[in-house]
Regions:
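Membrane-embedded catalytic cores of phosphoryl/pyrophosphoryl-handling enzymes
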Residues: 40-41, 78-165
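Membrane-helix interfacial "entry" motifs
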Residues: 10-18, 43-47, 51, 124-132
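Transmembrane-embedded, aromatic-rich helix segments that form part
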Residues: 31-34, 136
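Alpha-helical membrane-inserting segments
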Residues: 8, 36, 61, 65, ...
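Interfacial segments of alpha-helical transmembrane regions
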Residues: 33-61
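Alpha-helical transmembrane segments of integral membrane proteins
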Residues: 20, 46-54, 110-113, 134-138
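N-terminal transmembrane-helix/juxtamembrane module of multi-pass inner/ER membrane proteins
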Residues: 1-31, 62-87, 161-165
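Alpha-helical transmembrane segments in multi-pass membrane proteins
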Residues: 50-58, 62, 66, 139, ...
């Protein structure tokens, strides 16, 4: 097994476990809070639209990747700090979504906080024992792919429809 995964598995912190489980259970609500905070911090409709489009594209990319790759989670053969989810391991969906949310807010005053949250999310997935570092890296890489697709789609849509976001 990956030595970084083994290192994180050996580490045990009550506070980190609590934070990681909170992120695991409430990711959808956290992303909604990120959107509302972004909405409150900016009046730029284009960046808000990009955030929403990127979340939708990220979920689609995640579904396709998990269906195509279908790798078993490390917790199917090793101990984890929470119950082992039944879906595929690669890529980390929580990491993809949180990184995608951060990318969509680049230029926003809240971007550094979102980026820190994305990093914490990735670490928490390995710490809980439900993803490997490769799963997290795949989530980050696919977040960039989703972001590029979202920006291109939004640009095409606004040009073709002559819509001012």
């Amino acid at each position: 097994m990956d030595p970084i995964f083994v290192f994180f598995q050996a580490f045990d912190s009550g506070l980190l476990t609590t934070i990681a489980i909170f992120i695991d259970k409430y990711m959808a609500f956290i992303m909604l809070a990120m959107f509302l905070a972004t909405y409150a911090a900016t009046s730029d409709k284009k960046s808000l639209t990009l955030f929403i489009v990127n979340m939708v594209v990220s979920v689609l990319v995640l579904s396709i990747a998990k269906g195509l790759i279908d790798l078993p989670r490390p917790c199917t053969s090793m101990h984890s700090k929470i119950a082992c989810p039944a879906d595929a391991s690669y890529p980390s969906g929580h990491t993809l979504i949180s990184t995608g949310g951060a990318l969509a807010t680049a230029g926003n005053p809240l971007f550094p906080a979102y980026l820190a949250f994305a990093a914490l999310t990735g670490i928490s997935r390995v710490y809980l024992g439900i993803h490997t570092l490769y799963d997290v890296a795949g989530g980050i890489a696919l977040a960039f792919v989703s972001y590029a697709i979202s920006k291109q789609a939004l640009s095409f849509y606004t040009k073709e429809m002559r819509i001012e976001p």
